[in-house]
C-alpha cells in the first residue's frame, strides 16, 4: 500500500511537472502569438501607408494626364486658329491683289484709250497737264500697294508668332515637373524672394500669351487712392477701350512647402490648414486694398490672385472646396498657371481683333480717299475733254475761215502772182476730224467708278 501511494505520488509529480512544462510552452506560444500579431499590425499599417502612396501617385498621374490632354486640346485649337488665320490672310491678300490688278488694268486701259484716240489732239502742254492729273492717283495706288504689302508681312509675322506660342505651350507641358523642382529654393527663401519669383512666373505667362510690357501690361504701376495713398499693384493688364485687369502675384507658400516635405500625416494636415489660412489672409488683404477703385483705374470689381505653384492651388481647393467661393465673395479670383493662360490668351486675341479693326478702318478710309481721287481725276478729265472740244471747235472755225470757200487763203492767193517777194508756199491746213467723243468718255468714267 505504501509502495502504491509512493508510486502514485511519483506519477502525480511527473504529471505536475508535465503540466508546468506544458503551461510554460503555452505561455511561450501566447507570447509568440502576441509578437506575431504585433508584427502583423505593423505590416498592415505599412501596407495601408503604401496603398495611400500608390493612390496618391495614381491621382498625381491622372492629374498630369488631364493636364496633358488639356494642353493637347489647346494645341489643336491653336493649330485650327493658325489654319483659319492663314486662310483669312491669304484670301485678304488675294482680294487686295485682284483689286489692285483690276484697278491698274482698268485705268491703264482708260488712259490708253484716251491717249490712243486723242494723241494728235493733245499738244505737249496738254500731255503734261494730264500727267499732272494722273500723278496723285498713281501715288495713291503705290501707297495702297505698300500698305497691302505691310499688312501681309504683319500677318506672316503674326502666324510665325502663333506657331512659336504653340511650341512654347508644349515646352511648358513637358517641363512642368522641372519647374516644380526649381521652385524649392524659392519656397525656402525670404518673403521678398518668393514675391519676386511669383512676379517672374507671372510675367513669363504674360509674355507666353503674346503680351508686351508697357503695351499690353504694366508691372508695379503707380496709382493713388481717394485719400492720396500710394498703391503699386503687381501687374495691371491693359484691355481695349482703356480698361484694366489687375493681377497679384505675391503669395506666401512657406506652409505648403513644409507640408510637402513633412512625413507625418498629422503634421502635414496641420500645415495644409496653415497654408489655407495664409491664402485666406492674402485674400482679405487684397479685398481691403480695393484696387478696382483706385484713381485712374478702370477695372472690373475683382482682382486675380495668381498662385505660381499649380499643386499648391490644387491641394488647397481639395482640402477646402469652399476656398474659391471665399475669395469670390471678396472680389478675389484665385487662379493658377492653367486657369490664367486662357484669360491671358483671350486678352491677346482682343488686342489682335482691336488691331485688325483699326487696320480695316484705316484701309477703308484709304479706299475712300482713293475713290475720291478717282472721282476728282474723272471730273478733271471731263473738264479737260470739254476744254479740248471747245479748242477743237475754235480751231476748226478758224481753219474754215482761213481755207474755206470764202476763206482768206482764196482771197489772197492771187497776191502771189502780183508780187515777186511772195515766194513761200501756202501749207495745207486741215480740219481736225478726231473730235473728243464726250459721251463715250462719260460712259468709260462711269464704268470705272462702279
From Swiss-Prot:
Pfam family, one: RmuC
InterPro entries: DNA_recombination_RmuC
Biological processes annotated in GO: DNA recombination
Annotated coiled-coil segments of the chain: 3-89
Keyword terms, alphabetized: Coiled coil, DNA recombination
Family according to the record: Belongs to the RmuC family.
Functional summary from the UniProt entry: Involved in DNA recombination.
Matches recorded under PANTHER family: DNA RECOMBINATION PROTEIN RMUC
The name this protein goes by in its record: DNA recombination protein RmuC homolog
Organism: Haemophilus influenzae (strain ATCC 51907 / DSM 11121 / KW20 / Rd)
